[in-house]
Amino acid sequence: MSVNPFLGPANPVGGMTEAPPRHRLPDGPMAPSTAYQLVHDELMLDGNARLNLATFVTTWMEPEAGLLMAECRDKNMIDKDEYPRTAELERRCVAMLADLWNAPDPAGAVGCSTTGSSEACMLAGLALKRRWALRNAGRYPSREARPNLVMGVNVQVCWDKFCTFWEVEPRQVPMEGDRFHLDPAAAAELCDENTIGAVGILGSTFDGSYEPVAELCAALDDLQERTGLDVPVHVDGASGAMIAPFLDEDLVWDFRLERVASVNTSGHKYGLVYPGVGWVLWRDAAALPEELVFRVNYLGGELPTFALNFSRPGAQVVAQYYSFLRLGRDGYRAVQQAARDVATGLSARIGALGDFRLLTRGDELPVFAFTTAPDVTAFDVFDVARRLRENGWLVPAYTFPANRQDLAVLRVVCRNGFSEDLADLFAEDLTRLLPELRSQSHPLTLLTWDALRTARRAARALSGRR
């Protein structure tokens, strides 16, 4: 490491004669300012979180929220006996969400905080599986009784993980034509005596659309009338469970539907809290089998716990309560409406360019997906994503799952902090890129693959000569 003779802020590593090792512990300590600057400088190469239109995660909170989180960063959420007020704030958040989602008895709601929706979904899935196992104790476990879970192919990857980790057969309804999520009738047809439940997604990560949860419940009601099969529903509301209650109040998707056994959401998405915090609630105590709740007494009191992990920070739970207290229903409604307005306005501008076809418009989740227009052959969505990244915008390009792997799209997530001004800048940058993209003879992704194949053929030829 070369050492600049100018010490101080211009060269905070003054006095070091060599760079510290990257893949083993250094032999000795260094000054805190030096360690800070080394890490700080490396992190400058990360993308700008505010310009990351791929993530659903909250990237902005008020300074007061950050201050509260800093005051609580040393508190372990599991130590409820040592930190009773933090535990009380968690309980209040559960009650508030139960009221928001129309639980039969919000004051006595059953639920907990988690590290995010992935853990929340795992817990909800475990409850579904255990309830099914208890109902089928006479024949499970056995070779003939393998539990299965019905869902759309568009589910978040956590559901695939759940099925793999806990040996549940995933039964997925594929996409078809312009239907990019679950079909209720098709889902009901996949159910049998081994179905532990069905999952409805309130806000698909692929395109931001709501799945028809009420129609799914109606299809399962009809199935029960015809066959006697009683299939509960879990609503994965990672994003939509904090959008629909404020912007789509007439949409029935929650505990108002008797078949809905549990709901989860991500506090760190449209719950407007920094990562990571999630929530999972059950409609009543009967929906969460008692044997899944563990009780420990070695932290100073008899503590019930239902989680995949043990220790986790309490700061995010405190921040969630702060947001609930700070905004209230009207505040959340205003924030989410602003995000939806940005999404619908930006999608309309992109659709008007003529080079793209909108799949969704951001009028459910403030999220929309679009692809290239049918007559566009010079570039594809991967070219667009790459060029936008050169301007700092992080926009994901990806293909849809079965049976629409032929469809490649771009997705834009509009969230709190992505303002009208930023949306204008994004639209201007996209418009500015189009002339150059239109001038291409082929999508560069195709050219890249052609070049790769040519290089491989050349390598094989050289190898043969040797």
Write out the residue ranges for each language-model feature.
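Conserved PLP-binding active-site segment of the aspartate aminotransferase-like
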Residues: V199, P366-A378, G392-A427
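N-terminal entrance/gating region of PLP-dependent enzymes' catalytic architecture
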Residues: M1-G108, G392-W393, L430
